[in-house]
C-alpha cells in the first residue's frame, strides 16, 4: 500500500509518498506572516516566531500534521501546537515526527510515524 499527500503554493506542486500515512505542506516564503493567523498560535509558539520564515515553519508543520490526521484546520487548529520542533495535540506529545526544511524559497514540512524522511527531488514546473 502506498500513501501520498499533495501540497501546492505559488506555482510549486509537491508530493510526499510513503508506506504509511503521511502529511505534507509547503508555503512560498515570499508571503507575509498573517497577523490574524499569528494570533491563533499558542503563546509557546508565538515565543518561537520571530520572522516570516518562522511563521511558515510553524504553519507548514501544523498543516502537515492536520493532513496526516486527515482532518481540517478548522476542526483541530486549537488542539495543535508545534513547539521545539515537535507536534503536540491536546497538550500531549503527538508521537509523530515532523521534518522541516526550506528549499526553492519554500517552507516544507513532512509529518508521519517514520524514523526518518528523505528528500528525493525538487522540480519546479
What are these regions (language model features)?
Residues 1-125:
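Core catalytic alpha/beta fold that binds nucleotide/phospho-ligands
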Amino acid at each position: 500500500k502506498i500513501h501520498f499527500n499533495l501540497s501546492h503554493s505559488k506555482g510549486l506542486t509537491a508530493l510526499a509518498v510513503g508506506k504509511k500515512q503521511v502529511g505534507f505542506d509547503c508555503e512560498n516564503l515570499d508571503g507575509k506572516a498573517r497577523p490574524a493567523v499569528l494570533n491563533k498560535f499558542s503563546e509557546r509558539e508565538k515565543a518561537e516566531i520571530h520572522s516570516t520564515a518562522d511563521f511558515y515553519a510553524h504553519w507548514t508543520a501544523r498543516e502537515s500534521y492536520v493532513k496526516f490526521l486527515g482532518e481540517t484546520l478548522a476542526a483541530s487548529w486549537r488542539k495543535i501546537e508545534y513547539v521545539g520542533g515537535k507536534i503536540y495535540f491536546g497538550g500531549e506529545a503527538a508521537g509523530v515526527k515532523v521534518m522541516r526544511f526550506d528549499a526553492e524559497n519554500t517552507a516544507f514540512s513532512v509529518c508521519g510515524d517514520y524514523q526518518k524522511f528523505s528528500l528525493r527531488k525538487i522540480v519546479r514546473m
